[in-house]
């Protein structure tokens, strides 16, 4: 297969396209992008047959900012007959052997999601035929490749596969998170999703645990503080505005009525720093850089608001500058990740982990 199919948020196709064009080029996989505004997906068509396999193997999904999920894909199947949509799909997947799972999906648009009920019903007979053809194992296996069938419209679908060790565990790349009734704001879901995105499940007990100290800059009314509190942390919430009363009643939050850009922590045993302020992204990045250089945290999660234009270019420039400044100031052991999360809109979420190979004291 020579196509790479990438799911993204509707309206961010240009950013996703610019990113995959650059990243594929770094792996010497030539090709061109096919993308339309508000389709919520991008197709990167490689010049060489089977080159998409190189990308799904060697390009880490977690290293892509704007792609939620990706898979090596066939050419678009069109005019699938209502009487038998399955046969052309099974034929297009003939080179896929012993996959462990099949997902019948759509792009994340209102128009495409109208096909969701059909996709659920269609999955059952398709699964049976794929088992008969040998493309799918009789029993689900999380270690085997995943078959993707993505309907972009009635009778029109891309089909292909991803590798389970380089794929989102979520259907369409979207985590299904529930808004807690007592959360102070919907922004709470951003940090909830970020923890799942940036901290592997098997490490969460160690890195996101009860009793830790955390700081939330720009905390009001407490959406992100809520996620820290529910995980048993003690939080210094910094904001001139009021905090949610129920959060304050937990006894786990100390409210500092200060400007987040001027606040300095009294204690130096802070593990988590979080920040979701409506500010220019470069200014927020400079703030996090200062905290990192001072060694005031171990891990940070923060949001960068995106400009209206050149969003991919702006984000990559800020991240590159951040890494340069940290290194120039003696901070050389760190890991940076960035993702346009499902619960993000005109922003991206960044994770900065200082001394990732050194235990927290």
Swiss-Prot record:
Residues at which S-adenosyl-L-methionine binds: 187, 220-223, 239, 259, 276
Entry's EC annotation: 2.1.1.186
Family: Belongs to the class I-like SAM-binding methyltransferase superfamily. RNA methyltransferase RlmE family. RlmM subfamily.
InterPro entries: RlmM_FDX, RlmM_THUMP-like, RNA_MeTrfase_FtsJ_dom, rRNA_MeTrfase_M, SAM-dependent_MTases_sf
SUPFAM superfamilies reported for this sequence: S-adenosyl-L-methionine-dependent methyltransferases (SSF53335)
Keywords: Cytoplasm, Methyltransferase, rRNA processing, S-adenosyl-L-methionine, Transferase
Assembly description: Monomer.
Functional description taken from the UniProt entry: Catalyzes the 2'-O-methylation at nucleotide C2498 in 23S rRNA.
Superkingdom of the organism of origin: Bacteria
GO molecular function ontology, one term from the record: S-adenosylmethionine-dependent methyltransferase activity
Active site: 305
Provenance organism: Shewanella putrefaciens (strain CN-32 / ATCC BAA-453)
Pfam families named in the record: FtsJ (PF01728), RlmM_FDX (PF18125), RLMM_N (PF21239)
Chief localisation class: cytoplasm
Protein's cellular compartments: Cytoplasm
Protein known as: Ribosomal RNA large subunit methyltransferase M
Enzyme class: transferase
GO BP terms: methylation; rRNA processing
Catalysed reaction, written as an equation: cytidine(2498) in 23S rRNA + S-adenosyl-L-methionine = 2'-O-methylcytidine(2498) in 23S rRNA + S-adenosyl-L-homocysteine + H(+)
Transmembrane segments: none
Gene Ontology, cellular component aspect: cytoplasm
PANTHER family: RIBOSOMAL RNA LARGE SUBUNIT METHYLTRANSFERASE M, RIBOSOMAL RNA METHYLTRANSFERASE FTSJ DOMAIN-CONTAINING PROTEIN
Record's keyword annotation contains Hydrolase: no
């Amino acid at each position: 297969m020579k196509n790479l199919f990438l799911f993204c948020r509707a309206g961010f196709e240009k950013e996703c396209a610019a990113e995959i064009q650059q990243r594929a080029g770094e792996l010497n996989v030539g090709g061109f992008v096919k993308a339309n505004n508000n389709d919520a997906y991008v197709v990167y068509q490689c010049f060489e047959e089977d080159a998409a396999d190189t990308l799904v193997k060697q390009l880490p999904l977690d290293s892509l900012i704007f792609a939620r999920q990706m898979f090596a894909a066939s050419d678009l199947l069109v005019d699938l007959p209502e009487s038998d949509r399955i046969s052309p799909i099974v034929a297009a997947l003939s080179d896929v052997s012993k996959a462990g799972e099949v997902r019948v999906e759509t792009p994340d648009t209102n128009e495409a999601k109208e096909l969701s009920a059909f996709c659920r019903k269609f999955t059952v007979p398709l699964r049976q035929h794929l088992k008969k053809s040998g493309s799918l194992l009789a029993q689900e296996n999380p270690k085997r490749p995943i078959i993707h069938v993505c309907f972009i419209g009635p009778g029109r679908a891309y089909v292909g596969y991803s590798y389970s060790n380089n794929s989102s565990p979520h259907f369409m790349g979207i985590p299904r998170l529930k808004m807690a009734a007592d959360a102070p704001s919907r922004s709470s879901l951003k940090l909830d999703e970020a923890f799942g995105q940036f901290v592997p499940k098997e490490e969460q007990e160690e890195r996101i645990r009860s009793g830790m100290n955390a700081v939330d800059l720009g905390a009001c009314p407490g959406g992100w503080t809520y996620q820290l509190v529910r995980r048993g942390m003690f939080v210094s919430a910094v904001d001139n505005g009021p905090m949610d009363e129920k959060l304050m009643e937990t006894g786990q939050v100390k409210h500092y009525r200060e400007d987040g850009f001027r606040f300095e922590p009294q204690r130096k045993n802070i593990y988590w720093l979080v920040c979701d302020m409506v500010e220019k992204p470069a200014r927020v990045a400079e703030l996090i850089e200062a905290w990192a250089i001072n060694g005031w945290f171990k891990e940070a999660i923060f949001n960068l608001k995106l400009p209206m234009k050149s969003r991919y270019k702006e984000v990559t420039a800020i991240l590159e500058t951040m890494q340069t400044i940290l290194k120039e100031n003696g901070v050389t052991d760190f890991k940076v990740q960035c993702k346009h999360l499902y619960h993000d809109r005109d922003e991206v979420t960044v994770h900065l982990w200082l001394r990732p190979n050194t235990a927290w004291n």
